[in-house]
């Protein structure tokens, strides 16, 4: 009887310590679709096209490895109070979850940008770009794929265009 009680107690402890109440990026993206002031777009993969017909096979292969692209932004103007809250929420999600590894940070034209990834360094499954600027707003872009090569992703980004007809991507000019 003592063994059963010990095993049951260990199970209960394991159950409670394994529960994680941290919000995930996926939960944040879904919740943002319902929040006032947010701009959200899910870009269908068939909208991502090579800039020209003579792009490398690596670019074509990288495009094929992408499954989903999500964009979420909150323009600063008119959302001053929510800006700080949302910036801190995203910072917390990305910095406290061991799943997200920092790839690089940059500061360009007053926009602070952090790039994160999941997977291994040579086979990335997810790329997250998180940026913010006090006069622009806060936003996050997520590319989901399968075994993406970081150097090929950069090459691809320089060689693609997004067919924005029907997506109304101009609304992102408000934020960035």
Each language-model region and where it sits:
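C-terminal motif of bacterial Sec signal peptides marking the signal peptidase cleavage site
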Residues: 15-18
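A short, solvent-exposed beta-edge/loop patch
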Residues: 120-149
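Bacterial signal peptide processing site
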Residues: 20-23
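Generic detector of solvent-exposed, compositionally biased contiguous segments
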Residues: 34-60, 99-116, 166, 173
């Amino acid at each position: 009887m003592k063994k059963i009680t010990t095993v049951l107690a260990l199970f209960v402890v394991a159950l409670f310590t394994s529960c994680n109440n941290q919000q995930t990026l996926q939960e944040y993206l879904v919740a943002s679709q319902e929040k006032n002031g947010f701009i959200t777009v899910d870009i269908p993969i068939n909208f991502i096209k090579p800039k020209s017909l003579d792009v490398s096979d690596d670019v074509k292969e990288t495009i094929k490895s992408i499954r989903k692209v999500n964009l979420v932004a909150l323009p600063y103007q008119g959302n001053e109070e929510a800006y700080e809250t949302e910036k801190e929420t995203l910072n917390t999600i990305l910095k406290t979850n061991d799943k997200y590894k920092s790839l690089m940070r940059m500061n360009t034209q007053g926009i602070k940008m952090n790039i994160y990834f999941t997977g291994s360094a040579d086979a990335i499954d997810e790329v997250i770009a998180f940026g913010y600027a006090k006069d622009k707003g806060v936003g996050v872009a997520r590319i989901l794929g399968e075994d993406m090569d970081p150097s090929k992703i950069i090459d691809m980004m320089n060689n693609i265009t997004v067919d924005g007809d029907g997506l109304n991507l101009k609304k992102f000019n408000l934020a960035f």
